[in-house]
């Protein structure tokens, strides 16, 4: 050992030299990425991909270029050599050299023009039939691309078909961002072989949680909804949230995938928060039993009994402590009596991260 040089410094130098050497067999592959829907989620994902670009390359051997962007309003553009996202919005609107194609046939054609390896699907939820998102995913898999979505509809209405199609094509159909943003619920259970999920309960809709909190503070339902909309938490049309549809779709997705029991939305007993009064909500909080919109599912024989409804929960319980835009879920399995996950006030980056993580899983 050189005189006067601490051992830790020698180790650090050795590590730096080792990590700077080319890794044997470490092949970097470039993937063509396409974004279908370019609203908040996919825009945030694009930013996150840029932020993590070097790390993806260094740690996972993943390089990428964005070769296609499509929106319902503006049509689509594709360039297999790569698009400059900083100019995509202007290109969609005005650049005649890459004028967006609005042919309704064409998700498959667009993917072919972009030479897509990955589709990131983030279009609006259709609770009735999961369309057109299910067709988008079907087109991607038939084209030969991995399909990654943040849309819950295809999971509820076409999961087994799309899963089997992906397997037949040797591709991945992944959807981690559909429930609790980017929390890895589906991949978590995928890593638990032979575990059997018996049931779950939790709070999976953040909009109703915020509205109920504002009602506890004395606002009427309408005023609380308006405040949530002004904060950007509730949509202009918040029907899916306040009438329990969003929570029911998430419940159905969890049952379908994790319990392997296909369930229709009409099979889930559903009640929203629209009928709750400010007095009832305030009194519940005062008495230590606040209202929450609770999702429940329990295996019964070969089926599952499921519900979404406002319930009074003990304020000191895990569900009672959920506030703001946070979420909570508790799983009962045959071997683990209870597994709980809490997500604290996630933002768009959490949802985007779930899609990025699915990308890494798909190509690894």
Question: What is the predicted role of each segment?
Answer:
Residues 36, 40, 44, 64, ...:
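Conserved active-site and cofactor/substrate-binding residues in soluble primary-metabolism enzymes
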Residues 11, 25-142:
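N-terminal glycine-/serine-/threonine-rich beta1-alpha1-beta2 phosphate-ribose binding loop
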Residues 167-234, 245-246:
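Rossmann-like NAD(P)H-binding beta-loop-alpha module
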Residues 214, 225-321, 326:
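Substrate-binding/catalytic subdomain of NAD(P)-dependent oxidoreductase enzymes
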Residues 318-364:
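ATP-dependent carboxylate/acyl-activation modules
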Residues 126-139, 152-175, 188:
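Rossmann-fold NAD(P)-binding glycine/threonine-rich loop
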């Amino acid at each position: 050992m050189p005189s006067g040089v601490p051992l830790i410094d020698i180790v650090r130098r050795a590590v730096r030299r080792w990590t700077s050497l080319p890794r044997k067999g470490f092949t970097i592959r470039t993937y063509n990425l396409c974004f279908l829907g370019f609203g908040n989620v996919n825009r945030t994902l694009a930013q996150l991909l840029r932020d993590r670009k070097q790390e993806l390359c260094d740690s996972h051997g993943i390089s990428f270029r964005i070769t296609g962007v499509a929106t319902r309003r503006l049509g689509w553009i594709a360039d297999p050599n790569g698009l400059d996202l900083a100019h995509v919005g202007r290109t969609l609107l005005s650049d005649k050299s890459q004028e967006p194609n609005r042919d309704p046939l064409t998700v498959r054609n667009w993917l072919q023009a972009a030479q897509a390896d990955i589709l990131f699907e983030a279009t609006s939820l259709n609770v009735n039939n999961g369309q057109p998102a299910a067709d988008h995913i079907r087109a991607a898999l038939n084209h030969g691309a991995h399909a990654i979505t943040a849309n819950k509809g295809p999971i509820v209405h076409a999961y087994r078909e799309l899963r089997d199609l992906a397997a037949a094509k040797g591709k991945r159909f992944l959807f981690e961002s559909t429930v609790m943003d980017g929390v890895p619920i589906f991949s978590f259970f995928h890593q638990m072989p032979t575990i059997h999920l018996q049931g779950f309960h939790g709070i999976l809709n953040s909009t109703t949680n915020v509205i109920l909190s504002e009602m506890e503070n004395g606002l009427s339902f309408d005023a609380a909804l308006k405040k949530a909309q002004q904060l950007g938490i509730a949509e202009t049309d918040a029907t899916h949230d306040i009438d329990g549809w969003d929570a029911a779709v998430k419940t159905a997705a969890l049952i379908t995938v994790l319990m392997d029991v296909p369930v229709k939305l009409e099979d889930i007993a559903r009640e929203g928060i629209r009928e709750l009064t400010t007095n009832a909500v305030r009194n519940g909080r005062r008495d230590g039993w606040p209202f929450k919109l609770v999702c429940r599912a329990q295996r019964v024989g070969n089926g599952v009994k499921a519900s979404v409804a406002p319930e009074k929960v003990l304020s000191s319980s895990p569900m009672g402590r959920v506030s703001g835009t946070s979420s909570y879920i508790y799983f009962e399995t045959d071997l683990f009596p209870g597994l709980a996950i809490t997500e604290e006030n996630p933002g768009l980056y959490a949802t985007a991260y779930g899609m990025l993580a699915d990308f890494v899983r798909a190509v690894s």
